[in-house]
C-alpha cells in the first residue's frame, strides 16, 4: 500500500475504538439507568428498580469509569490528530468524530450526575498536577461546553461520510437534543433553547438526506448495523481479543439457551408491566384477541404467541412459547419453566443464534460476544425532538411541520393509522417512550422533565406498575399444549401488594461512585461557575 494511503487508514483505525471499547463498561448501566430506573424494564431486587442505588454499586462504578474513559480517549486522539501528517479533510473528519463522541459522553454524565468536572485536554491536566482536585462545574456550564464541542465538531465533519460514521448532521441531531434537554434546566422552559432545538432538528430532517427505515424492526437487525436512520451507534466487533470490543448485551437480556454458547441469563427480567400498559396490551390477554396494532411492541418485547422470523432462521424462526415448553426445540432453554415475571422478554439487543449472526455479518458470534450494533441516537428521536420543540412553551400544536414529524414516526409503527391533526406534549412524551423503549434513553427524559417539573416526573414514576404478575406459566403452558386460554384471577394476577417506589427530587441525580470521590474529594463540594467559552477553545 502506498505510504499516504497507509497513513490514511492508520488515522481512521486510530479513532475507530471510540465507537466501541471505551463504551464497553457502560453497557449494563445503559440498561439499568436508562430502562430499569425509568420503569420500562423489571429486574427483581435491582436497586435501580426501587431507587436504592448507592455509591458502591458495581454498575454505577463501571458506568462512570466508561464515560470518563471515552472523554480521555477522545481528548488524546483529538490532540494527536492536530499534528498528524495527513490531509486536512481526513484529519478534520476524525477530529470531528472525537469531539462528537466526547460531547455524547458529557451528555450522559451531566444528565446522570449533574455537575461534573470538565477535562478539556489530558496533557494540560497532567502537567498542572490538579487532575485529582478538579471541582465540579455547574450543570449549565457543562451543557454550554457540550454545545461548544458539538459546534466545533459540526465545523470539522463532512456533510456525509462513510456509512455508520458520524457526520455533520449526526452531530447536529445531538445538538438539537441537547438544546431540548437544556431548555428546562433553570426551572422553567427557555423559549430560545426550544427554538434552537427546533431549528437544528429541522435542518437534520430536511437536509441530511437520511430517512426512517420502512420497517421498524429492521433498524435493530445485524444486516442493518450501519443504516441511515442511526446517527450515533456503538459498532462492536465479534471477538474477545481485546476484551471490550464486543457487544455482550444478549448475555444479560436473553433467556437461557437462546444461543448455543451457554452465556444467556436474562430470562427472569424483562420489559415491565407498565411498558406493556403503555402499548395498550396485557400479558393476561390471549394472543388471539390482544390488540397488537403497534409493530414496535413485538420488536421490543416477546410475549405469548410471538414468532420471530429473524431469530433462529435455521429452525424456521423463533417461537417464544415453544422454546419454553418444547424441550427438544428449546434445548438448553427454560425446559418448561416460564421465567419472566412480567409476561415479556427482551427483543432489542438480541442477535439470535450463531447461524443468525453468520447470516447477518458473515462471521461467528461466541461466548459473550457479538457484533450487533447498539444504536444510541436515531433519526426518529430527532423527529420527536422537533415535534416537541416546535410547540415552544405551549402544550399542543397544529403546526403542520410538527405534525408531519410526529406522524412519520407513529405512522411507521402503526400501518394505516389515521394521522393526527393536533398533538399535545403528552402525545410526544408517550410516543418517545414507545419509539425508544429499551434503548437506554427513557430515564433521561424523566431527568429533563424533572429540571422544570419534578413533581410531575415523581408522580408518574410512583404511579407506574413496576412489579410482577403471579403464575403466568399456568395460563401459558395450557395455551401452548391445548390452545385454551384461561386466566384464574385468584391465581394469575398482578401483585396486589406492589409498592410505589420512593422517588424524590434527589432521585434524578445519581451519586458519584466511591472510587471517584476517593480519587477526587472535591466532587463532594459545591460546583463552580466556569465561563467555558473564555476558558476553553478548540
Residues of each region from the PLM?
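An aromatic- and glycine-enriched ligand-binding surface/loop that stacks and positions planar moieties
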Residues: 1-40, 143, 151-152, 165-331, ...
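Conserved, well-structured interaction surfaces
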Residues: 5-10, 41-113, 134-144, 149-163, ...
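Flexible, polar/acidic helix-loop-strand segments at domain edges
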Residues: 284-378, 537-538
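Long, intrinsically disordered, low-complexity segments
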Residues: 67-68, 145, 220-275, 281, ...
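Short coil/turn linking the two alpha-helices of tandem helical-hairpin repeats
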Residues: 110-117, 161, 181-188, 392-396
Amino acid at each position: 500500500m502506498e505510504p499516504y494511503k497507509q497513513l490514511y487508514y492508520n488515522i481512521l483505525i486510530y479513532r475507530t475504538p471510540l465507537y466501541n471499547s471505551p463504551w464497553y463498561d457502560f453497557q449494563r448501566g445503559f440498561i439499568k439507568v436508562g430502562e430499569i430506573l425509568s420503569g420500562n424494564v423489571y429486574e427483581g431486587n435491582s436497586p435501580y428498580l426501587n431507587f436504592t442505588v448507592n455509591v458502591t454499586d458495581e454498575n454505577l462504578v463501571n458506568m462512570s469509569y466508561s464515560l470518563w474513559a471515552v472523554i480521555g480517549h477522545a481528548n488524546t486522539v483529538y490532540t494527536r490528530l492536530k499534528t498528524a501528517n495527513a490531509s486536512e479533510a481526513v484529519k478534520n473528519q476524525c477530529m470531528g468524530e472525537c469531539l462528537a463522541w466526547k460531547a455524547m459522553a458529557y451528555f450522559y454524565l451531566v444528565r446522570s450526575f449533574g455537575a461534573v468536572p470538565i477535562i478539556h485536554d489530558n496533557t494540560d491536566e497532567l502537567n498542572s498536577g490538579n487532575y485529582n482536585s478538579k471541582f465540579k462545574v455547574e450543570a449549565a456550564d457543562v451543557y454550554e461546553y457540550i454545545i461548544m464541542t458539538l459546534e466545533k465538531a459540526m465545523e470539522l465533519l463532512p456533510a456525509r461520510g462513510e456509512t455508520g460514521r458520524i457526520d455533520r448532521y449526526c452531530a447536529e441531531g445531538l445538538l438539537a437534543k441537547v438544546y431540548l434537554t437544556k431548555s428546562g434546566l433553570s426551572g422553567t422552559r427557555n423559549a430560545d433553547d426550544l427554538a434552537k432545538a427546533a431549528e437544528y432538528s429541522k435542518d437534520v430532517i430536511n437536509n441530511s438526506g437520511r430517512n426512517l427505515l420502512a420497517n421498524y424492526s429492521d433498524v435493530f437487525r445485524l444486516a442493518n448495523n450501519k443504516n441511515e436512520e442511526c446517527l450515533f451507534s456503538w459498532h462492536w466487533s465479534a471477538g474477545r481479543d481485546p476484551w471490550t470490543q464486543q457487544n455482550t448485551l444478549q448475555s444479560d437480556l436473553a433467556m437461557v439457551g437462546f444461543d448455543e454458547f451457554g452465556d444467556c441469563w436474562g430470562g427472569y427480567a424483562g420489559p415491565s408491566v407498565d411498558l406493556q400498559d403503555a402499548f395498550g396490551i396485557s400479558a393476561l390477554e390471549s394472543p388471539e384477541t390482544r390488540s397488537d396494532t403497534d409493530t414496535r411492541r413485538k420488536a421490543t418485547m416477546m410475549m405469548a404467541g410471538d414468532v420471530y422470523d429473524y431469530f433462529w432462521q435455521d429452525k424456521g424462526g423463533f417461537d417464544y412459547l415453544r422454546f419454553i415448553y418444547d424441550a427438544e426445540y428449546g434445548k438448553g432453554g427454560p425446559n418448561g419453566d416460564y421465567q419472566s415475571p412480567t409476561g415479556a422478554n427482551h427483543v432489542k439487543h438480541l442477535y439470535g443464534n450463531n447461524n443468525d449472526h453468520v447470516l447477518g455479518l458473515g462471521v461467528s458470534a461466541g461466548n459473550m460476544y457479538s457484533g450487533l450494533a447498539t444504536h444510541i441516537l436515531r433519526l426518529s428521536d430527532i423527529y420527536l425532538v422537533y415535534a416537541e420543540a416546535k410547540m415552544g412553551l405551549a402544550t399542543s400544536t397544529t403546526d403542520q411541520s410538527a405534525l408531519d414529524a410526529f406522524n412519520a414516526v407513529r405512522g411507521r409503527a402503526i400501518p394505516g393509522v389515521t394521522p393526527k391533526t393536533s398533538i399535545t406534549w403528552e402525545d410526544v412524551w408517550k410516543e418517545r417512550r414507545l419509539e425508544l423503549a429499551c434503548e437506554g434513553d427513557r430515564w433521561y427524559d424523566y431527568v429533563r422533565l424533572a429540571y422544570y417539573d419534578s413533581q410531575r416526573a415523581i408522580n408518574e414514576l410512583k404511579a407506574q406498575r413496576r412489579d410482577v404478575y403471579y403464575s403466568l406459566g399456568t395460563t401459558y403452558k395450557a395455551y401452548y399444549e391445548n390452545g385454551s386460554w384461561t386466566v384464574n384471577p385468584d391465581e394469575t394476577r398482578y401483585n396486589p401488594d406492589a409498592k410505589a417506589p420512593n422517588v424524590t427530587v434527589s432521585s434524578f441525580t445519581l451519586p458519584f461512585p466511591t472510587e471517584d470521590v476517593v480519587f477526587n474529594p472535591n466532587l463532594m463540594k459545591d460546583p463552580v461557575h466556569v465561563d467555558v467559552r473564555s476558558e476553553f477553545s478548540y
